[in-house]
């Protein structure tokens, strides 16, 4: 099998290929919280803005933050005029919903700061991968750890993260988020756009990482050439005291 030698534009690949894979998660969370007119929502790690766009379509007043400059630029292009998307979160609005659909342990200091300006009772949503045995993408992600020569890092403990930010638990859920791609090349580009393989690319080279991702994808390539990987994501809802 030969590597997929295609130009890579990570932010655009994220926006055009990968970001939509979590639409079921966004919808489930918004339904759970009743996001709509009157909701003031801040999206942390908002990427190129799809989750914000969906909340705005429900009538919510939204703002976003992401440290990836290229993704922020794309979010500003696609979101309605007047929506603020910055590289650092604004604390100007008294948010009543804060989402972190790609939660990591690194967001804890910023989360503590934001919750101080949030309304009492405001919902904070933290989300991440579900159980490894329920995620077909997990063996593919192990490629990144192996090529970067370190043990696979466990995902963040969402409940501990909420507790560390001084929040009180309010609920949780699991959502099926299958990753479906039109082709193997599309799957490689989408997965590379997540940033999960950046360290592996630095440790080896892009063509090697592409080749090994393709090999790991082989069990999930269907006869028509499409790629289908069932996954489950988990979210935790916590409240500002």
Language-model regions: role of each:
Residues 40-42, 47-91:
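Class I SAM-dependent methyltransferase SAM/SAH-binding core
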Residues 112-113, 121-182, 198:
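Conserved catalytic/acceptor-binding region of the Class I
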Residues 38, 94-95:
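Local beta-strand N-terminus motif with an aromatic residue
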Residues 33-35, 56, 79, 118, ...:
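A generic alpha-to-beta junction signature in SAM-dependent methyltransferases
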Residues 1-39, 50, 71-74:
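Conserved class I S-adenosyl-L-methionine
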Residues 95-109, 130:
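A short SAM/SAH-binding and catalytic strip from SAM-dependent methyltransferases
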Residues 48-50, 161-241:
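Conserved Class I S-adenosyl-L-methionine
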């Amino acid at each position: 099998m030969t590597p997929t030698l295609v130009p890579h534009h990570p932010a655009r690949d994220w926006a055009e290929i990968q970001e939509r894979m979590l639409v079921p998660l966004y919808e489930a969370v918004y339904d759970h919280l009743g996001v709509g007119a009157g909701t003031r929502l801040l999206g942390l790690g908002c990427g190129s803005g799809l989750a914000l766009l969906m909340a705005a379509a429900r009538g919510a007043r939204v703002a976003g933050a992401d440290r990836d400059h290229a993704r922020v630029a794309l979010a500003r292009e696609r979101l309605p005029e007047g929506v603020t998307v910055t590289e650092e979160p604004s604390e100007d609005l008294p948010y009543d919903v804060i989402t972190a659909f790609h939660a990591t342990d690194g967001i804890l200091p910023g989360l503590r700061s934001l919750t101080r300006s949030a309304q009492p009772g405001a919902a904070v949503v933290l989300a991440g991968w579900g159980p490894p045995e329920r995620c077909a993408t997990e063996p593919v992600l192990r490629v990144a750890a192996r090529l970067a020569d370190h043990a696979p890092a466990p995902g963040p403990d969402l409940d501990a993260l909420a507790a560390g930010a001084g929040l009180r638990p309010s609920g949780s859920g699991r959502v099926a988020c299958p990753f479906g791609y039109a082709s193997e090349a599309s799957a490689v580009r989408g997965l590379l756009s997540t940033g999960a393989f950046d360290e592996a690319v630095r440790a080896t080279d892009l063509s090697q990482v592409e080749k090994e991702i393709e090999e790991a994808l082989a069990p999930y390539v269907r006869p028509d050439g499409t790629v289908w990987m069932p996954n489950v994501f988990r979210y935790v809802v916590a409240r500002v005291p």
